[in-house]
Structure formats: structure tokens, C-alpha cells
Amino acid sequence: MQKRAIYPGTFDPITNGHLDIVTRATQMFDHVILAIAASPGKNPMFTLDERVALAQKATAHLSNVEVAGFSDLMANFARDRQANILIRGLRAVADFEYEMQLAHMNRHLMPQLESVFLMPSKEWSFISSSLVKEVARHQGDVTHFLPDNVHQALMNKLK
């Protein structure tokens, strides 16, 4: 039986920290779905289609990764995709409380849905999409934190 996992997030935009998590997940699971949430309430900089395209290009070298957008409940998306594992990244203790709430709610909605928490590599432990966008808005160099295609897209958005 194939182990299918979902790594959900807004990915606005996808960072090297996200790529670190998804790359490591590909070594643990047969198939990883990078699930990009529409998240209209977060007022994303990039459209859902743009975020999907950026992530597809950034993960093209990972043969067992599929990128898909979604706007439904995560538990419903997981059920539809026949995945029973959620991958979540934990950067700091502060992330844990919120992630624990999400894990319990998802498990309530889909009892067989397990959450697996991965810590990013030390190099990426402090970055977030929001922080990268904020630094870039103030002309800070964020090249190191983003895949090349994403960096170019971000610079174009900020022009």
C-alpha cells in the first residue's frame, strides 16, 4: 500500500524552508501532495494559480511530488486524495499550539488522518513567507531564502 502524505499551506510564496520540508518528506513517503490553500482570508500576494505554478517549477526535480490547489477543508481534501498523513513544519515552540489545534480538529473530521511534524533544517528555521515578503518590500536581499523562479516572481510583483 502506497503511503500518501499531504503537505498543506498557503505557500505565499513557497520558500527554501518549505522545500526543505517537502524534500525530506519525499524520503519518508511514496507520494507527497503539496496542497496549496486558496486562503482568501489571508489576502495572498500571489493568486492560487500563481502559487501552484511557482511550486510546480520549484519542485519539478522531485519525482514523487504533486502540486495541487484546494479551497475545501483539509480533511475533505485528504479524503478525496486518499491520503491519511498530514505533514506540518514546526519552526518554534510558538507554532506548536496552533498546529496541535489543527491536528485535533483534522482528526475529529477524519479520524484516520495523522499529523506528522517536521522541524526545518537549522538554516531555514527562522524564515516564513511573510518575513521574506516584508524584507523584500524594503529592498532587503532575500535571494538565499527562495528558489530562483520564486525570487524572480516576487521581484516582479514588488515592481
Swiss-Prot record:
Site annotation (Transition state stabilizer): which residues? H18
> Catalysed reaction per UniProt?
(R)-4'-phosphopantetheine + ATP + H(+) = 3'-dephospho-CoA + diphosphate
Q: Which residues bind ATP?
A: T10, F11, H18, G89, L90, R91, E99, W124, S125, F126, I127, S128, S129, S130
Q: In which pathway does it act?
A: Cofactor biosynthesis; coenzyme A biosynthesis; CoA from (R)-pantothenate: step 4/5
The role this protein plays is: Reversibly transfers an adenylyl group from ATP to 4'-phosphopantetheine, yielding dephospho-CoA (dPCoA) and pyrophosphate.
Q: Per UniProt, where does substrate bind? A: T10, K42, M74, R88
Q: Which cysteines are joined by disulfide bonds?
A: none
Family matches, as InterPro entries: Cyt_trans-like (IPR004821), PPAT (IPR001980), Rossmann-like_a/b/a_fold (IPR014729)
Where, subcellularly, is it found?
Cytoplasm
User: What family does the Swiss-Prot or TrEMBL record give for this protein?
Assistant: Belongs to the bacterial CoaD family.
Which BP terms does GO give this entry?
coenzyme A biosynthetic process
Subunit details = Homohexamer.
One annotated GO molecular function? pantetheine-phosphate adenylyltransferase activity
Q: Which GO terms describe its cellular component?
A: cytoplasm
Q: Which CDD domains match?
A: PPAT
Q: Which cofactor does it need?
A: Mg(2+)
Organism of derivation? Salmonella arizonae (strain ATCC BAA-731 / CDC346-86 / RSK2980)
Under what name is this protein listed?
Phosphopantetheine adenylyltransferase
